[in-house]
C-alpha cells in the first residue's frame, strides 16, 4: 500500500498527576544557609538598612535604582526581570534621543537587545544577521568564554566547524544559524535521526520542485524546527519526530487520516474512484459492461491466458490496519518529507487555511506527485509563486467572487445573503466525500479522478471550480432553523405543557358542564385528550424533518435520507391520533364510559409517553436507525467531522445527567403546581363563561360572546411562554449550585475549611510553582521560594501598586544569624502568618487595592489542584497571538491631559487619578525623587550651605504640578512616564504587550531559580548569564501581534510601535504589506510580512521584514478579526497558542503557572511512547483542543455600567464555565483560552471567517473542536486581566454584536449538526449555555407583551361588568354572587402569579454574580456589590439589555446585517445628546416600551393590582434607561442646551442635507426594510453609505407583518367588548365602534397625504422663485406640514376622548387600537409598496423645495415623486408620534431634574465616586456662559410652555367633561353610533341573566 493512506493525527497523553498542596520539606523552617556558595549565588536577602550592600546587590542583579532611593532604602531583587516600563536604554522618539534615566528610573537595566553588551573582555556587538528570537552573538564572541560553558554550549560555539549548519543557500537570512544553534534540543548528542541540515535540504528541494515561495519555505522550516525542538526537549528525538508526524499525518486523531478514509482515498489508491459508483454506504465497484480483451496476440497463440482477477474494495477496518502498518514502517526522512510538504502547502494557503479538508486534498495530490517517478525527473520550477498562482489563487478568487466583485482595484460587496453564497464550509465539505471529489473537472471536461495520481497536482490550475462547488447547507434567514436544530427542546416543553394543561382543562373536554356540579369529564375522553401530547411531539418532529429537507440539499452526500424517517413519523402520528378519533368520533357517550374505551385511552397514554420520551432523548439524525458499525463507511465524514464527540469520563457524565435530572425534576414539579394547577380555575371560569346582552353595529353579539374564549386563548400562549422561562430559571439555579459545589471541591472558595491560604503559600510555591524534583536538594526551599516571592512583590512595586513601606514588610530579608558567627539567614515576612492572625494590625497593602486582589487570588489559586510542572528546558514552546486593528497602542499626552470632546467634563488623567488614587501617589512619589536626583546632578551646590540646598530644592519642586499631571518639567522623558502610567491603566496594546511579556520574565525567573548551577557557572559574568536566560525565554515563548494596518499606520502609530519594539525586541509583528499595482493592473500586490525588534531599518526608517510572503489577494474577506488572525498563523511558533485581545493584561505571578497550564493538555507523558506502537493508549484518547481560563475584568468597581459588564463576564467566564467544562458544554470564546495549535490549525484555524455569518468568530473554533472530537477544559487557578466597555452605548453595541452574532449562529450548519446529533445531556448543556440564553431573552420580552395583551383584554371586560365575589378557599361550584356577575377574580390571581414569575426570571440574573462574590470574596463584599447595583438602578439596565439582546436576534433573523462592531475601549464620561440616544435606541426598545407603557396604563386604570408596580418599573426602564445612564443627564443647564439641540434635530434636513437630523434617522430606519438602490455595474458604492440590500419578504413576514397584524385584532376585540355595553337590554343604544376607530385611525393618514400633495404642489410652483430670496423656503414649508400633523395628533386624541364620553380608560384603549392599525398599515406600505431608497436625500429636498431638476435622479424622476408621496405620508405621522413621545420622555425626567444637587448624586450613582472626588464641571469662557444662559432662558421657557399645553389638554377635559358632554352633543354622531354613552355598568344591579350553565 502506498503511503497516501497516511494522514494527520493528534495524540493524547494520560492524566497528569496532581501535587498534594501541602507537601513541603521541613527545611522551610530553617533560618540559616548551610550550603557553601549560597550567599554568593543568591545574595538577595540584604538588610534594608544597609545602603552599601543594597547598592552592590542592585549592581549584581543588573537593576537600575535611579530615582528609587528614599531614606537610603532600596529594594533587593532576587532575579533580574523585565519591567513593564521600558528598559534602561537610549531610544529615539520624535527625532530625539532620550536617556534611559528619563523614564526607567525604577526598572531593570536589561540591555536593549540591539545595543552593545559587556561580556567579560569587552564590548561584543550582536551580529548584523541574527535569529529572530534572540541568538545575539557570533561564534567568535562566544568563543571568548567557551571555557566556562557547558559541553552543549561549546558544541554550539564550534557549530560551523562541525558542518552541521554550514548552509549554502544563497541568502543572508541563514547567517544567524551560523552564530548558534537556535534549536538546542535537536542536536547530534540527542541521537537525532536526521540532521537540521538534511531537513533544510528537504525543504529547499520541495520549494524548488513545487514552486513554493522562498520566504515561505524559510518561515516553515523555522516553524518545523521549533516544533521539533519543543517536542525533543521532553522526549527522545526519534519519538519527537514520530509524534509530530502522528499529529499531522498518520495518528489516530490526525485530521488528515480521518479525511483520507472519509473521502475514500484508500479506495482511490487501490482501485481508483473512477472505477466506483457511489452510494450512502460508500463506493462500490462498477460492473463491467463487456469482457476484457485479450492481453496480447502472443498470449492468445501460446494459450496462456491468465484468469481474470476480481477487484474488490477492502473493508474499512482492513484499510485502517494497512494504514497503521504503513505508518509504523515509515523512515524518518519520509516522515520529514511529508511534514515539510504539508507545512509548505499550509503556509501559503492564505484563506484556504479555513478549509482544512481542501488542504488535505491538495496535500494528497502533491504527495502523490512527490512519490512518483516524475518527481525525481522533474526540473526545479523557476517561478517561486507557482504553487500560489496555480493552486491557491484560483480557489481564493472563487471564494472572493462569491461575496465581492473587484472594481477599480477595490472589493465591492455583492448583494447576496448566506443562502446564495458558496462559503468556506461549502467548499470544504465538497472534499468530505468521494462524490464531491468526483465533481472536480478541468476546463476541458476531464474528471480529475480519471487522471493518473501523479498528474493531478499539476492539473489543479486547469480545474473549473465553478462546476465543482455548490451549496451544501442553506443558511437562510428563517425561524425554521430553530425548529430543526432545537427540536428536542420544543418536544420536551410543548408535550409536557400539553399533558399538564389538558389534564387541568376538563371543561374543554366536557360537553355538558354545569357550574353547580363542577367538571366531571369522562375518564376515557380525558385521558385520550391528554395522550394527544404524543401527536404534538410527532408533529414537531415532522416539522423538523420538513425544514431539514429545505435547508440541506438532497444532492449533498452528507444529507441524511429523510423519506424513511418522514413516513415512520407519519405512522407515529396516526398511531397517536387514531385512539382519540376512535374514542370521540366512533363512540357514543355510553361507550365512552365503558372499561374498554378507558383501556384504549390508558394504552394510548402509555404509547404517547413512549413517543415523547423517545423523541426527547434521541437526536433527530439518529431516529429510526441502528448505530453505525466502526467498520462501516456509511456517512463516515459526518461521523468524523460533525459528530465525533469526546466521551465524558464516568464522573463527569454522572454530574451531567444529575444536573439535568435536577433541573427538569424541579422544573416539572414547580411548573405543575405553580403554573398549570393554578391555571385550572381561570380555565374553568373562562371556558364556561357566556357574556350576555352585548352588541355593536355590524357584528352584533357574534364577537363579544367569544371574548372570554379569546382571553383564555391568549392566556394559554402566555402560560406556555412562562413554561419555557421556568426551565431556564432552574438551569441558572442548579448550575450555580453545582458550580459552587465544584469550587468547594477545588478549594477556590474562601469558605473552604482549609482557609489558611497565606500561611501555606511558601510551601505551595515550592511544591506547585517550582519543579522541585529537578532542583538540587542541597538548596534550601526557603532560598528558592524567597526569590519567587520577592520577584512578585517587586513587580507589584514597579507597577506602582505598592509603596516602598509595603515592600519592606512583604519581602524576605537577609539578616545576620542569631548565632553570632557572621553567617546570614533569611527572615520570613510576617505577612504569611498575619493574614490568619487578627492580632496583627500591620498594613501590607492598601485595602481593596489591586495588589490585595492579585496576591489573594495567587494564594487562593495555589490551594487548588495544579498539574506538576516540568523543567523549564523541557516545557513546550507556545505563542501568544494578539490581533490588532485600530486599538490604541500608547496614549498620547494630548489624549491624557485634554478633554476628548466638548461633551466631556474630565480629562482622562484626572479620571484615572480618581480611580487609582494610591497608585498615582506612588507614581508621583517616584517622579519627585527622580526630579530631585536630576536637579542635584545638574547644578553645582558645592558652595552652598546644606540647609540652603534643602530649602531651595523644596521651593523648586512644589508638589502641585506633580500631583496634577505627573511632571513639572515637560521634557519628553517625564511626559513619557505619565503616558506609560496612563496607558497601563487603560485598554491599550502597550498594556497587553507589557503584561504578556511577563511570560518571558517568568520563564527566566523559573529557569534561574530551578537551575542554580547555571548562576554558579556564570558567576561574575552577569551579561553572559542574562544572555543565557534570554535565550531560554525566547526559545520557549513567543508573542505575535497581528497588526493588519501596520503598513498604513500614521506617524504617531509608527512611533508608538517602535517604542514597543525597542522595549520588547523579541515581540513579533505580522502585518499586511502592499506593493503598488503593476503596469496594466489595478490591484495592488499584498504580502504577509513579519518583523521584530531586531529587524533592520531601511533608508526610510522602516523595518525590513524577516519574511515577506506573497498573497493571492486581499485576505480580509470576512469581518476582519478572523482574517487578521489567519494572516499571522504561519508566524506562530510552538505547540500551543494563547489567543488574546488587545485590551487584556497579565501578571508575573500568573505567568509563573504557565507550565502547569500547558500540562493540562495532557501531552507531557510522551517521553518514550511511539505514537504508532500498538500498545500506545495515549493517542487513542480524545485530545485536549482548548484550555479555557478565567478572566478578571479590571473595569469593575469603577461605576455601575462597567461593574455590570464585568459581572456578566465573571459569571459566564468563571461560574458557568466551571460547570460547563466538566459536563462537556463549554466552547471557545476567544480570550484568554489556550489552543492546541496543531489540532486547531489542521482543522480550519483558530476561528471562522465568512462575512456576517461568522461575526462571532471565536465560538466557531470551539464548535469545530467539539464536533471533531476535541476536549475543552477550564482552568481555575490562572486568570488574565480583561478590559470591558464602560459606557451605555458601547455596552449595548457589544450586546448588539453578540445578539446579531447569535442570530447568525442559529442559521449556521454548526448549530444544525450539534442540535441534531448531540447526546441528550450534552445537547441540553450546549443549548442552555448558548442559544438558550438568547431564546430565553426573547421569551421574556414575549411574555411581557403577551401579559400586556392579556391585561388589555381582561381590562376591557373588567371595566364594564360586575365581578363576582370570590373566596380563594371555596370551590367554584358555589353559586356566584351577585347575580349576573362575571367570575374574573381567578384570572386576576393568575395575573399576579405571572408577574411574580416574570419578576423572578429577571431577578435571577443577579443570583450568579452574588453567589460568585459570596464564594470568592465573602458575604460583605457580595452584599456591598449587590447593594451598589440596586442603588444604581442596575435592574433597569438589565431590563433594557434583555430587550436589546432579544431585538438583536430577531432583527438579524429578519433583516441580517450582522457585522463586527468595534466596542469601546475608553471611559464613558461624556454626556450624549438626547437626539443621539433616542435615534440609537428608539427602534430596539423605546418604541416597544412606549406601546407597552400605554397598555399598562390602560390595565392600571381598569384592573389595578399592586403587582403592576413592577411592570411600571420595567416598562419605564425600556423607555428611559438610555437617559438614566447618560452622564450628567440631569445637569440643569446641559438639559436645556440639549433640548435646543433636540428641537434643531427635529427641524433640520429639509432644505439642505444634514447627517444629524430626524429625517435622516427616519430614512435610515426605513432602509432596513427597503434597502438602497442597487448600484450600477462598475460604479463603486457611494462613500459614507453602508450598502444595505433589501430584506427578503419571507424573512420580514413574521416580525414586520404577522406580529403587527395579530396586535390589531387582539386590541380591537377588547375595544369592541368595552363599547358593547354588556348587560344593556336596550338594543337602540347600540354604538358603532368599528366605524369610529377606522375614522380616527385613517384620518391622520389622509390629512398627511393631502398636506403632502398640497405642499409639494406649492413647492413646485413657488419654490424655484422664492428660493432666490428665501433660502429657507423648503424648511418653512416642511415645518408647517409637520406642525399640521402634530395638531392632527392632538385633534384625534381629543375627539376620541369626546366620542368615548370623556372616559379616559376607553380613550387610552382607543389610542392603542389606532396605533396598532396605523402601525400595521405603515408596515404593509413599507414592505409591499416602497421601492429601494436612493443613497442620497435628493428626493426629500426636492419635495419641499420644488427643485426636482437638479437632483441627478435620471430615469428615477418618473417614479420618485409617487414613491416620495408614500414616504411623506408615513413620515409626517411618524414625526407627530416622535414629537409627542420625545416630549413625554423629557417631561418624565423633569421631576428628577428639579431635585437639588441631582447632578452630583447622579454622578455618584454612575461612577461610584465620593462627593469629594466628583468630576469637576466644565470651564467655559464668559461669552460661552452668557450664550448658555440665554439658551436656557429661551428654550427653558419653550419647554415649560409645552409642558403646560400638554397638561392643559389632559386637565381641562377632566375638569369640564360633564359640561362639554352636555353642551356639545351632536345628533349625527348619535345617528351613526359614533358617540359612546356615558359609562354605565348594566350588570351591577342584578338581572335574570347568568354567565354560566348552573
Swiss-Prot record:
Pfam families documented for this protein: FKS1_dom1, FKS1_dom2, Glucan_synthase
Membrane topology: Multi-pass membrane protein
Positions with biased composition (Polar residues): 32-51
Top-rank lineage group of the source organism: Eukaryota
Biased composition (Basic residues): 286-296
GO terms under cellular component: 1,3-beta-D-glucan synthase complex; plasma membrane; prospore membrane
Gene Ontology terms, MF aspect: 1,3-beta-D-glucan synthase activity
Protein localization: Prospore membrane
Broad class of the protein's primary localization: membrane
Entry similarity comment: Belongs to the glycosyltransferase 48 family.
Conditions for induction: By sporulation.
Assigned keywords, A-Z: Glycosyltransferase, Meiosis, Membrane, Sporulation, Transferase, Transmembrane, Transmembrane helix
Protein name: 1,3-beta-glucan synthase component bgs2
Species annotation: Schizosaccharomyces pombe (strain 972 / ATCC 24843)
Transmembrane feature ranges: 530-550, 566-586, 600-620, 655-675, 710-730, 731-751, 1338-1358, 1394-1414, 1476-1498, 1503-1525, 1598-1618, 1637-1657, 1673-1693, 1697-1717, 1778-1798, 1837-1857
Catalytic activity: [(1->3)-beta-D-glucosyl](n) + UDP-alpha-D-glucose = [(1->3)-beta-D-glucosyl](n+1) + UDP + H(+)
Enzyme class: transferase
Role of this protein: Alternate catalytic subunit of the 1,3-beta-glucan synthase (GS) complex. Synthesizes 1,3-beta-glucan, a major structural component of the yeast cell wall. Has a role in ascospore development where it is required for the assembly of a functional spore wall.
Enzyme Commission (EC) number: 2.4.1.34
Annotated region (Disordered), positions in chain: 1-53, 282-310
Subunit structure: Component of the 1,3-beta-glucan synthase (GS) complex, composed of at least the alternate catalytic subunits bgs1, bgs2, bgs3, and bgs4, and a regulatory subunit chr4.
GO biological process annotation, one example: fungal-type cell wall polysaccharide biosynthetic process
InterPro entries, sorted: FKS1-like_dom1 (IPR026899), FKS1-like_dom2 (IPR056261), Glyco_trans_48_dom (IPR003440)
Amino acid at each position: 500500500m502506498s503511503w497516501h493512506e497516511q494522514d494527520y493525527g493528534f495524540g493524547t497523553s494520560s492524566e497528569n498527576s496532581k501535587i498534594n498542596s501541602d507537601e513541603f520539606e521541613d527545611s522551610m523552617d530553617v533560618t540559616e544557609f548551610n550550603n557553601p556558595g549560597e550567599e554568593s549565588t543568591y545574595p538577595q536577602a540584604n538588610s534594608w538598612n544597609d545602603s552599601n550592600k543594597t547598592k552592590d546587590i542592585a549592581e549584581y542583579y543588573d537593576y537600575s535604582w535611579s530615582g528609587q532611593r528614599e531614606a537610603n532604602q532600596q529594594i533587593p531583587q532576587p532575579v533580574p526581570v523585565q519591567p513593564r516600563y521600558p528598559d534602561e536604554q537610549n531610544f529615539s522618539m520624535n527625532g530625539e534621543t532620550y536617556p534611559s534615566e528619563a523614564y526607567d528610573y525604577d526598572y531593570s537595566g536589561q540591555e536593549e537587545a540591539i545595543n552593545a553588551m559587556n561580556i567579560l573582555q569587552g564590548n561584543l556587538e550582536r551580529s548584523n544577521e541574527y535569529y529572530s528570537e534572540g541568538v545575539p552573538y557570533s561564534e567568535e564572541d562566544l568563543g571568548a568564554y567557551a571555557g566556562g560553558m557547558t559541553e552543549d554550549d561549546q558544541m554550539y560555539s564550534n557549530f560551523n566547524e562541525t558542518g552541521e549548519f554550514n548552509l549554502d543557500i544563497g541568502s543572508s537570512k541563514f547567517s544567524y544559524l551560523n552564530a548558534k544553534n537556535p534549536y538546542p534540543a535537536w542536536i547530534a548528542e540527542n541521537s537525532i535521526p536526521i540532521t537540521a541540515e538534511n531537513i533544510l535540504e528537504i525543504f529547499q528541494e520541495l520549494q524548488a520542485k513545487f514552486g513554493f515561495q522562498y520566504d515561505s519555505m524559510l518561515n516553515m522550516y523555522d516553524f518545523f524546527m521549533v516544533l521539533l525542538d519543543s517536542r525533543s526537549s521532553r522526549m527522545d528525538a526519534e519519538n519527537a519526530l514520530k509524534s509530530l508526524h502522528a499529529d499531522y499525518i498518520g495518528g489516530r486523531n490526525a485530521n488528515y487520516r480521518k479525511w483520507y478514509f472519509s473521502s475514500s482515498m484508500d479506495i482511490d489508491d487501490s482501485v481508483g474512484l473512477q472505477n466506483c459508483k457511489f452510494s450512502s454506504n460508500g463506493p462500490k465497484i462498477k460492473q463491467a459492461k463487456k469482457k476484457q480483451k485479450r492481453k496480447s496476440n502472443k498470449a492468445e497463440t501460446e494459450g496462456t491466458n491468465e484468469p481474470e482477477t476480481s477487484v474488490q474494495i477492502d473493508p474499512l477496518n482492513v484499510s485502517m490496519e494497512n494504514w497503521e502498518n504503513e505508518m509504523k514502517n515509515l523512515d524518518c526522512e519520509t516522515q520529514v518529507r511529508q511534514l515539510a510538504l504539508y507545512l509548505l502547502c499550509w503556509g501559503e494557503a492564505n484563506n484556504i487555511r479555513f478549509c482544512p479538508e481542501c488542504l488535505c486534498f491538495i496535500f494528497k495530490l502533491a504527495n502523490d506527485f512527490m512519490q512518483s517517478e516524475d518527481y525525481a525527473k522533474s526540473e526545479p520550477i523557476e517561478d517561486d509563486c507557482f504553487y500560489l498562482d496555480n493552486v491557491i489563487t484560483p480557489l481564493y478568487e472563487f471564494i472572493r467572487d462569491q461575496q465581492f466583485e473587484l472594481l477599480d482595484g477595490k472589493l465591492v460587496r455583492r448583494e447576496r445573503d448566506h443562502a446564495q453564497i458558496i462559503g468556506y464550509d461549502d467548499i470544504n465539505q465538497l472534499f468530505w466525500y468521494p462524490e464531491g471529489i468526483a465533481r472536480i473537472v478541468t476546463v476541458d471536461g476531464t474528471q480529475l479522478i480519471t487522471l493518473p495520481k501523479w498528474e493531478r497536482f499539476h492539473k489543479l490550475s486547469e480545474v473549473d471550480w465553478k462546476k465543482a462547488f455548490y451549496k451544501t447547507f442553506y443558511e437562510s434567514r428563517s425561524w425554521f432553523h430553530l425548529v430543526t436544530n432545537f427540536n428536542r427542546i420544543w418536544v420536551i416543553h410543548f408535550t409536557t405543557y400539553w399533558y399538564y394543561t389538558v389534564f387541568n382543562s376538563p371543561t374543554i373536554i366536557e360537553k355538558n358542564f354545569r357550574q353547580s356540579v363542577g367538571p366531571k369529564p369522562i375518564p376515557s375522553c380525558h385521558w385520550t385528550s391528554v395522550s394527544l401530547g404524543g401527536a404534538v411531539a410527532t408533529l414537531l418532529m415532522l416539522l423538523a424533518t420538513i425544514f431539514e429537507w429545505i435547508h440541506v440539499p438532497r444532492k449533498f452526500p452528507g444529507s441524511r435520507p429523510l423519506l424513511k424517517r418522514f413516513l415512520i413519523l407519519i405512522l407515529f402520528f396516526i398511531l397517536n391520533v387514531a385512539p382519540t378519533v376512535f374514542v370521540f368520533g366512533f363512540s357514543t357517550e355510553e361507550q365512552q364510559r365503558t372499561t374498554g374505551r378507558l383501556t384504549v385511552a390508558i394504552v394510548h397514554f402509555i404509547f404517547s409517553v413512549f413517543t415523547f420520551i423517545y423523541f426527547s432523548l434521541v437526536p433527530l439524525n439518529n431516529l429510526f436507525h441502528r448505530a453505525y458499525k466502526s467498520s462501516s463507511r456509511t456517512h463516515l465524514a459526518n461521523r468524523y467531522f460533525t459528530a465525533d464527540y469526546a466521551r465524558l469520563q464516568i464522573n463527569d457524565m454522572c454530574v451531567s445527567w444529575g444536573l439535568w435530572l435536577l433541573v427538569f425534576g424541579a422544573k416539572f414539579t414547580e411548573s405543575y403546581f405553580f403554573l398549570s394547577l393554578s391555571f385550572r380555575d381561570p380555565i374553568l371560569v373562562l371556558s364556561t363563561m357566556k357574556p350576555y346582552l352585548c352588541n355593536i353595529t355590524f357584528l352584533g353579539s357574534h364577537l363579544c360572546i367569544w371574548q372570554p374564549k379569546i382571553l383564555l386563548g391568549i392566556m394559554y400562549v402566555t402560560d406556555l411562554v412562562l413554561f419555557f422561562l421556568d426551565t431556564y430559571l432552574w438551569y441558572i439555579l442548579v448550575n450555580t449550585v453545582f458550580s459552587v459545589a465544584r469550587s468547594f471541591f477545588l478549594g477556590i472558595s474562601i469558605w473552604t475549611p482549609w482557609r489558611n491560604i497565606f500561611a501555606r503559600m511558601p510551601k505551595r510555591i515550592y511544591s506547585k510553582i517550582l519543579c522541585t524534583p529537578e532542583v538540587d536538594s542541597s538548596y534550601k526551599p526557603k532560598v528558592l521560594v524567597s526569590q519567587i516571592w520577592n520577584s512578585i512583590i517587586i513587580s507589584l512595586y514597579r507597577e506602582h501598586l505598592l509603596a516602598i513601606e509595603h515592600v519592606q514588610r512583604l519581602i524576605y530579608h537577609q539578616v545576620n544569624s542569631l548565632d553570632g558567627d557572621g553567617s546570614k539567614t533569611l527572615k520570613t515576612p510576617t505577612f504569611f502568618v498575619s493574614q490568619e492572625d487578627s492580632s496583627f494590625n500591620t498594613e501590607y497593602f492598601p485595602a481593596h487595592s489591586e495588589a490585595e486582589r492579585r496576591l489573594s487570588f495567587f494564594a487562593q489559586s495555589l490551594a487548588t489542584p495544579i498539574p506538576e510542572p516540568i523543567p523549564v528546558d523541557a516545557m513546550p514552546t507556545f505563542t501568544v497571538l494578539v490581533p490588532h486593528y485600530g486599538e490604541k497602542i500608547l496614549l498620547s499626552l494630548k489624549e491624557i491631559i485634554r478633554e476628548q470632546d466638548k461633551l466631556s467634563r474630565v480629562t482622562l488623567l484626572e479620571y484615572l487619578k480618581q480611580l487609582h488614587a494610591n497608585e498615582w501617589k506612588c507614581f508621583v512619589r517616584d517622579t519627585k525623587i527622580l526630579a530631585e536626583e536630576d536637579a542635584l546632578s545638574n547644578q553645582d551646590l558645592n558652595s552652598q550651605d546644606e540647609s540652603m540646598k534643602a530649602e531651595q530644592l523644596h521651593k523648586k519642586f512644589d508638589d502641585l504640578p506633580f500631583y496634577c499631571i505627573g511632571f513639572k518639567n515637560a521634557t519628553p522623558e517625564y511626559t513619557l512616564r505619565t503616558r506609560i502610567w496612563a496607558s497601563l491603566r487603560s485598554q491599550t496594546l502597550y498594556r497587553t504587550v507589557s503584561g504578556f511579556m511577563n511570560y518571558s520574565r517568568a520563564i527566566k525567573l523559573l529557569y534561574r531559580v530551578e537551575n542554580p548551577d547555571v548562576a554558579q557557572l556564570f558567576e561574575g559574568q552577569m551579561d553572559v548569564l542574562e544572555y543565557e536566560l534570554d535565550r531560554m525565554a525566547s526559545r520557549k515563548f513567543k508573542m505575535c501581534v497581528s497588526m493588519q494596518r501596520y503598513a498604513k499606520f500614521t506617524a504617531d502609530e509608527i512611533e508608538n510601535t517602535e517604542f514597543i519594539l525597542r522595549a520588547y525586541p523579541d515581540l513579533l509583528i505580522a502585518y499586511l504589506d502592499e506593493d503598488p499595482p503593476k503596469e496594466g493592473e489595478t490591484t495592488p500586490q499584498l504580502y504577509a510580512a513579519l518583523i521584530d525588534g531586531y529587524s533592520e531599518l531601511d533608508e526610510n526608517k522602516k523595518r525590513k521584514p524577516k519574511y515577506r510572503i506573497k498573497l493571492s489577494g486581499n485576505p480580509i474577506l470576512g469581518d476582519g478579526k478572523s482574517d487578521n488572525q489567519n494572516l499571522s498563523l504561519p508566524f506562530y511558533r510552538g505547540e500551543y497558542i494563547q489567543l488574546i485581545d488587545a485590551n487584556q493584561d497579565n501578571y508575573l505571578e500568573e505567568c509563573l503557572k504557565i507550565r502547569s497550564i500547558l500540562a493540562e493538555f495532557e501531552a507531557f507523558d510522551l517521553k518514550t511512547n511511539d505514537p504508532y506502537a500498538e500498545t500506545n493508549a495515549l493517542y487513542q484518547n480524545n485530545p485536549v483542543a482548548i484550555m479555557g481560563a478565567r478572566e478578571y475584568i479590571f473595569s469593575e468597581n469603577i461605576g455601575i455600567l462597567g461593574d455590570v459588564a464585568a459581572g456578566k463576564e465573571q459569571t459566564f467566564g468563571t461560574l458557568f464555565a466551571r460547570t460547563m467544562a466538566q459536563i462537556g458544554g463549554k466552547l471557545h470564546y476567544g480570550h484568554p483560552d489556550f489552543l492546541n495549535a496543531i489540532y486547531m490549525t489542521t482543522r480550519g484555524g483558530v476561528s471562522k471567517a465568512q462575512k456576517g455569518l461568522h461575526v462571532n468568530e471565536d465560538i466557531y473554533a470551539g464548535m469545530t473542536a467539539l464536533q471533531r472530537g476535541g476536549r475543552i477544559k477550564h482552568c481555575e487557578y490562572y486568570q488574565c486581566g480583561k478590559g470591558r466597555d464602560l459606557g451605555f452605548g458601547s455596552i449595548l453595541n457589544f450586546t448588539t454584536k453578540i445578539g446579531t452574532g447569535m442570530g447568525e449562529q442559529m442559521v449556521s450548519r454548526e448549530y444544525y449538526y450539534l442540535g441534531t446529533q448531540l447526546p441528550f445531556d450534552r445537547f441540553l448543556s450546549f443549548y442552555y449555555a448558548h442559544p438558550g440564553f438568547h431564546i430565553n431573552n426573547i421569551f421574556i420580552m414575549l411574555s411581557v407583551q403577551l401579559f400586556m395583551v392579556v391585561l388589555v383584554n381582561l381590562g376591557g371586560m373588567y371595566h364594564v361588568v360586575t365581578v363576582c365575589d370570590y373566596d380563594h378557599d371555596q370551590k367554584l361550584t358555589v353559586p356566584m354572587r351577585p347575580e349576573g356577575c362575571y367570575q374574573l377574580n381567578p384570572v386576576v390571581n393568575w395575573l399576579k402569579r405571572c408577574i411574580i414569575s416574570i419578576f423572578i426570571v429577571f431577578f435571577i440574573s443577579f443570583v450568579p454574580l452574588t453567589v460568585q462574590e459570596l464564594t470568592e470574596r465573602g458575604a460583605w463584599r457580595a452584599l456591598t456589590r449587590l447593594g451598589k447595583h440596586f442603588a444604581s438602578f442596575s435592574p433597569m439596565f438589565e431590563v433594557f439589555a434583555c430587550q436589546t439582546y432579544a431585538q438583536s436576534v430577531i432583527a438579524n433573523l429578519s433583516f441580517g446585517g450582522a457585522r463586527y462592531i468595534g466596542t469601546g475601549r475608553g471611559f464613558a464620561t461624556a454626556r450624549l445628546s438626547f437626539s443621539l440616544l433616542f435615534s440609537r435606541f428608539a427602534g430596539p426598545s423605546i418604541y416597544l416600551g412606549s406601546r407597552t407603557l400605554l397598555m399598562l396604563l390602560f390595565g392600571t386604570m381598569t384592573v389595578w393590582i399592586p403587582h403592576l408596580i413592577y411592570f411600571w418599573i420595567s416598562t419605564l426602564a425600556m423607555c428611559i434607561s438610555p437617559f438614566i445612564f447618560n452622564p450628567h443627564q440631569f445637569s440643569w443647564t446641559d438639559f436645556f442646551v440639549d433640548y435646543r439641540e433636540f428641537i434643531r434635530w427635529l427641524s433640520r434636513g429639509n432644505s439642505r442635507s444634514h447627517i444629524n437630523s430626524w429625517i435622516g434617522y427616519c430614512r435610515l430606519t426605513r432602509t432596513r426594510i427597503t434597502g438602497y438602490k442597487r448600484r450600477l455595474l462598475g460604479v463603486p458604492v457611494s462613500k459614507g453609505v453602508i450598502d444595505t440590500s433589501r430584506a427578503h419578504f419571507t424573512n420580514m413576514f413574521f416580525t414586520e407583518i404577522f406580529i403587527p397584524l395579530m396586535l390589531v385584532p387582539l386590541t380591537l376585540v377588547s375595544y369592541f367588548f368595552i363599547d358593547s355595553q354588556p348587560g344593556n337590554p336596550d338594543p337602540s343604544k347600540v354604538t358603532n365602534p368599528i366605524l369610529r376607530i377606522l375614522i380616527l385611525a385613517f384620518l391622520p393618514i389622509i390629512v398627511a397625504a393631502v398636506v403632502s400633495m398640497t405642499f409639494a404642489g406649492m413647492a413646485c410652483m413657488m419654490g424655484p422663485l422664492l428660493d432666490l430670496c428665501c433660502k429657507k423656503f423648503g424648511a418653512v414649508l416642511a415645518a408647517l406640514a409637520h406642525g399640521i400633523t402634530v395638531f392632527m395628533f392632538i385633534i384625534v386624541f381629543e375627539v376620541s376622548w369626546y366620542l368615548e364620553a370623556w372616559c379616559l380608560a376607553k380613550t387610552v384603549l382607543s389610542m392603542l387600537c389606532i396605533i396598532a392599525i396605523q402601525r400595521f398599515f405603515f408596515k404593509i406600505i413599507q414592505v409591499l409598496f416602497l421601492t429601494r431608497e436612493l443613497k442620497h436625500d435628493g428626493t426629500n429636498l426636492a419635495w419641499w423645495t420644488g427643485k426636482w431638476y437638479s437632483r441627478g435622479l435620471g430615469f428615477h424622476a418618473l417614479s420618485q415623486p409617487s414613491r416620495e408621496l408614500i414616504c411623506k405620508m408615513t413620515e409626517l405621522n411618524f414625526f407627530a408620534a416622535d414629537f409627542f413621545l420625545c416630549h413625554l420622555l423629557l417631561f418624565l425626567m423633569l421631576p428628577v431634574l428639579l431635585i437639588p444637587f441631582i447632578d452630583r448624586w447622579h454622578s455618584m450613582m454612575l461612577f461610584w465616586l465620593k462627593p469629594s472626588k466628583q468630576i469637576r464641571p466644565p470651564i467655559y469662557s464668559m461669552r460661552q456662559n452668557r450664550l448658555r444662559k440665554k439658551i436656557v432662558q429661551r428654550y427653558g421657557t419653550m419647554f415649560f410652555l409645552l409642558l403646560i399645553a400638554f397638561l392643559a389638554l389632559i386637565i381641562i377635559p377632566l375638569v369640564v367633561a360633564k359640561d362639554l358632554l352636555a353642551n356639545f352633543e351632536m345628533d349625527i354622531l348619535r345617528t351613526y353610533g359614533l358617540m359612546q354613552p356615558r359609562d354605565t355598568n348594566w350588570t351591577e344591579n342584578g338581572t335574570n341573566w347568568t354567565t354560566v350553565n348552573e
